[in-house]
């Protein structure tokens, strides 16, 4: 069985991507164009990709392809209708980055709310060591506690962010992108209300 990994560099080097026990594996660091895909997968049985265009144009001359595995949750790079017509299965990684995206959301929130750039520069530039006072409040910073955190898109990531925001003492409100959210533990509001009432707003939608 021939396995082709089109975008090895789309995942970190700390993540093992060794499929040799499954078959003959060919690795490419990156694959961008339809022409590159077509040339590299023409003899493949399984293709592992991320953003490489898996379209009819790139798949039509690869008669042996039976499975496309995505290094991601999304699969908008894959022509699903064409794959169905060929009997090619498509697999993705569901919920692979929920915790990390939520973590990064709060890293950004802290960066903004605590004015970390300003105070980091202030200390590293020597201004803090040179001042005669102990504290510096030249640029005000704020707590998350007591603030309203608005969320657009209450899927897996949105719900994880909501739980973390709540643990910091935030009131959580959200707007459903589809209008059909079944989430009941947080207040659902219309878009204008979300914008008017939120101190912090995070988007977790396509």
Can you describe what each PLM-predicted range is?
Residues 44, 62-65, 197-198:
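An anion/phosphate-binding loop that grips the pyrophosphate of nucleotide cofactors and donors
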Residues 76-86:
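Rossmann-fold NAD(P)-binding glycine/threonine-rich loop
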Residues 135-206:
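Rossmann-like dinucleotide/phosphate-binding beta-alpha-beta segment
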């Amino acid at each position: 069985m021939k396995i082709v990994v089109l975008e090895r560099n789309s995942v970190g080097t700390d993540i093992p991507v060794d499929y040799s026990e499954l078959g003959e594996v060919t690795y490419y660091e990156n694959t961008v164009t339809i022409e590159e895909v077509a040339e590299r997968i023409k003899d493949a049985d399984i293709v592992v990709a991320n953003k490489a265009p898996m379209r009819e144009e790139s798949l039509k001359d690869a008669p042996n392809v039976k499975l496309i595995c995505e290094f991601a949750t999304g699969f908008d790079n894959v022509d699903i209708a064409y794959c169905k017509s060929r009997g090619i299965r498509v697999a993705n990684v569901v919920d692979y980055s929920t915790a990390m995206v939520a973590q990064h959301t709060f890293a950004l929130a802290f960066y903004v709310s605590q004015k970390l750039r300003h105070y980091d520069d202030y200390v590293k530039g020597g201004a803090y060591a040179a001042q005669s006072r102990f504290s510096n409040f030249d640029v005000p910073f704020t707590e998350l506690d007591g603030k309203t955190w608005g969320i657009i898109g209450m899927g897996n990531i949105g719900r994880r962010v909501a739980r973390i925001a709540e643990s910091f003492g935030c009131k959580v409100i959200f707007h459903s992108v589809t209008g059909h959210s079944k989430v009941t533990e947080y207040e659902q509001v219309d878009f204008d209300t979300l914008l008017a009432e939120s101190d912090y707003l995070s988007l977790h939608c396509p």
